[in-house]
From Swiss-Prot:
The gene is mtnN. It comes from the Bacteria. Catalyzes the irreversible cleavage of the glycosidic bond in both 5'-methylthioadenosine (MTA) and S-adenosylhomocysteine (SAH/AdoHcy) to adenine and the corresponding thioribose, 5'-methylthioribose and S-ribosylhomocysteine, respectively. Also cleaves 5'-deoxyadenosine, a toxic by-product of radical S-adenosylmethionine (SAM) enzymes, into 5-deoxyribose and adenine. Substrate binds at residues 78, 153, 174-175. Pathway: Amino-acid biosynthesis; L-methionine biosynthesis via salvage pathway; S-methyl-5-thio-alpha-D-ribose 1-phosphate from S-methyl-5'-thioadenosine (hydrolase route): step 1/2. This is 5'-methylthioadenosine/S-adenosylhomocysteine nucleosidase. GO terms for biological process: L-methionine salvage from methylthioadenosine; L-methionine salvage from S-adenosylmethionine; nucleoside catabolic process. CDD domains: MTAN (cd09008). Belongs to the PNP/UDP phosphorylase family. MtnN subfamily. The active site is at 12 (proton acceptor), 198 (proton donor). HAMAP family: Salvage_MtnN. It comes from Shewanella frigidimarina (strain NCIMB 400). InterPro entries: MTA_SAH_Nsdase, Nucleoside_phosphorylase_d, Nucleoside_phosphorylase_sf. GO terms for molecular function: adenosylhomocysteine nucleosidase activity; methylthioadenosine nucleosidase activity. Its EC number is 3.2.2.9.
Amino acid sequence: MKIGIIGAMEPEVVHLVQAIVDPVHTTIAGIEFISGSIAGKDVVVTRSGIGKVAASIATTLLIEKFAATHVINTGSAGGFVDSLAIGDIVISSEVRHHDVDVTAFGYEIGQMAQQPAAFMPDSTLVNAAKSAVAELGEVKAIEGLICTGDSFICDPVRTKVMRENFPTMAACEMEGAAIAQVCHQFNVPFVVIRSLSDNANNDSPVDFDSYIIKAGMHSAMMVIALLQQL
């Protein structure tokens, strides 16, 4: 088992990089990959950059160049569940695009043509994440739908539409569904684990800048605890 771990931004991967034993650095297409081990597991950690295209490139390289057999996406997200606070965690029960619309051809809202409507995470990784929750102290974690789009969501009008389209959505972010789609194409197991940095509202730009470090630390703690369960 070799586990590829992807975060979009430096605060989302810095704690994981610091935890790597015997790190080896490789740069491809301007993306740095750090190989080594965490909790005795072979890992490759990368900061992909923000958005679906960047995440897709990094995921493909992890699988093709570094032979990742499993992929974990970690980082921050905007929350859509009132019971969760900033810093709490959502473990993907499924992952969908929220900004895709080819319904004119009979697809569901959010479903890319010739792709499943939802990408389902690997049960072993999800169960390991659920078992790891006990290691997080007072940080709350739930399973839920995570939706992805190439926009930072802070507009109440957009938020309202997203809630109508995806009433069970727990969190939104900008990479997870792209990573999940690449993993689906390559038949590689994945899970998305996100810590809330904001609540997808008018305050989100300020909240994100204030809490991205906290969210990154919590999601990294979750990933390390997950690796210890495997």
